């Protein structure tokens, strides 16, 4: 009797987990279908080439234009810049915290990183708008500090907690025996960390980079507050608009074709994120198979 009861409970638990997993899949499918249904009509009316490669966005003009190439390039440049700044800093910090830092320093820094992860996006944007934007204007002697550079710096800071925490967890999970064997062969601790521990934790570090990319390309509020939110072609010291901020800034008052075009932008952003994640996962799996 007890065996049957345990089996029933086990089956019930498995059923609950299966349902929860299916709910997650269903949510993704619903979002995908909704974006496709809502975004395709505008692309059909505007024209795929004009929509993706048009350089002019004047959605509220008497004769509106709906070219999103500036938004696409700005999102690519902004994300790439944030990754180039944030990943090296986050990676080196994670190696230090996981392998080199004294316990007291580690505890303080880890708490600070956790606090950084919990700060709302609007606070990042507010601090960036009040401190970073004027600083860029003064240091580089430009008319307006609200620019692509300001957005890159803010995004780089925002992705640091994800990169540091995930990379650190992966490095701490490397078996101690690997490092002991390296040290026994005469390698220094630093050589061991970078030639043994880091390669062993590369899957987790790659996952941290994927999380960082997702956070950077999906951010809207903080970016909108420091980038100027003007639909220009991207330049480092010029006010720009990202894919996310284009949707966030106009959706509240949009209607008709303009509203449909914003859904099309959301669809492009969604596909863009899926493409990046798929590419990074493919490269990671190929690296595993070659290794």
Locate predicted features.
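Transmembrane alpha-helical segments of polytopic membrane transport and secretion proteins
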Residues: 1-21, 280-291
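Cytoplasmic-entry segments and transmembrane alpha-helices of multi-pass inner-membrane transporters
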Residues: 14, 89-128, 291
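Transmembrane alpha-helix signature in integral membrane proteins
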Residues: 68-96
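Generic hydrophobic transmembrane alpha-helix motif, especially the helices
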Residues: 114-156
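Glycine/proline-centered hinge or cleavage motifs at structural transition points of membrane proteins
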Residues: 120, 185-186, 199
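Transmembrane alpha-helices
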Residues: 166-167, 189-224
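C-terminal transmembrane helix and the adjacent membrane-cytosol boundary/short C-terminal tail
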Residues: 168-172, 176, 183, 252-291
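Interhelical loop and adjacent transmembrane-helix boundary motif
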Residues: 223-270
């Amino acid at each position: 009797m007890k065996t049957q009861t345990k089996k029933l409970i086990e089956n019930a638990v498995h059923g609950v987990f299966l349902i929860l997993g299916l709910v997650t899949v269903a949510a993704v499918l619903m979002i995908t279908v909704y974006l496709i249904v809502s975004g395709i009509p505008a692309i059909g009316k505007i024209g795929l080439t004009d929509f993706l490669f048009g350089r002019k966005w004047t959605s509220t003009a008497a004769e509106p234009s709906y070219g999103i190439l500036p938004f696409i390039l700005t999102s690519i440049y902004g994300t790439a810049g944030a990754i180039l700044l944030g990943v090296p800093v986050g990676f080196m910090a994670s190696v230090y915290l996981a392998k080199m830092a004294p316990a007291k320093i580690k505890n303080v820094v880890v708490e600070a990183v956790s606090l950084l992860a919990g700060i709302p996006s609007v606070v990042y944007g507010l601090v960036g708008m009040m401190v970073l934007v004027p600083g860029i204007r003064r240091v580089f002697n430009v008319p307006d500090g609200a620019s692509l550079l300001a957005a890159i710096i803010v995004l780089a800071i925002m992705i640091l907690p994800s990169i540091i925490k995930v990379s650190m967890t992966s490095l701490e999970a490397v078996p101690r025996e690997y490092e002991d064997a390296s040290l026994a062969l005469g390698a220094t601790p630093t050589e061991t960390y970078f030639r043994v521990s880091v390669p062993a934790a590369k899957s987790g570090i790659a996952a941290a980079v994927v999380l960082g990319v997702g956070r950077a390309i999906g951010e809207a509020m903080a970016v909108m507050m420091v980038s100027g939110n003007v639909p220009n072609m991207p330049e480092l010291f010029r006010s720009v608009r990202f894919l996310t901020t284009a949707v966030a800034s106009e959706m509240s008052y949009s209607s008709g074709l303009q509203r449909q075009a914003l859904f099309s932008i959301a669809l492009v952003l969604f596909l863009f994120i899926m493409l990046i994640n798929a590419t990074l996962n493919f490269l990671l799996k190929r690296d595993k198979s070659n290794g």
